[in-house]
Amino acid sequence: MSVNMEDLRHQVMINQFVLAAGCAADQAKQLLQAAHWQFETALSAFFQESNVPSAQHHTHMMCTPSNTPATPPNFPDALAMFSKLRTSESLQNSSSPAASNACSPPGNFNPYWASSPPNQQPVWLPPASPTTHLHHHHHHPQPVWPPNSQPTGGPQKAMAAMDGQR
């Protein structure tokens, strides 16, 4: 059985065009033939046709794109909803569920991975790793609470006592 490679290539291009544009196969074939099988040219023609209706295009039925990632069901409505979301985020405080869900990190997010602000010690340190007890000479700076007060030595004595118990 011999298959004409040119026909096969055209069929593959038609299928790709249908997937990319969301139109019918016969319309894809017409556009590709008109563009001399130049995929990008035909795709541009398809989207320019669907965006700029003119009198000559009303004689044949136009196939509008289906719901593809490139073409949402109703693009103006999607844009309006997106702009409302942005506006409502900036106008509402973060206690509203819509704004907090839109801006909140996921539940397993650890906010302490980031560095502390300059000229300020961290208020919380992550727990020591299981291998830390092997390295007694590595001491982490002690957190200061409240942030603007000076350490009195009490927490350091407690840490020294804990190190002695290990």
UniProtKB/Swiss-Prot annotation:
Ranges annotated as spanning the membrane: none
Family: Belongs to the UBALD family.
Protein name, UniProt field: UBA-like domain-containing protein 2-A
CDD domains per record: UBA_F100B_like (cd14343)
Organism: Xenopus laevis (African clawed frog)
Stretch list, region Disordered: 120-166
Entry-linked Gene3D superfamilies: DNA helicase RuvA subunit, C-terminal domain
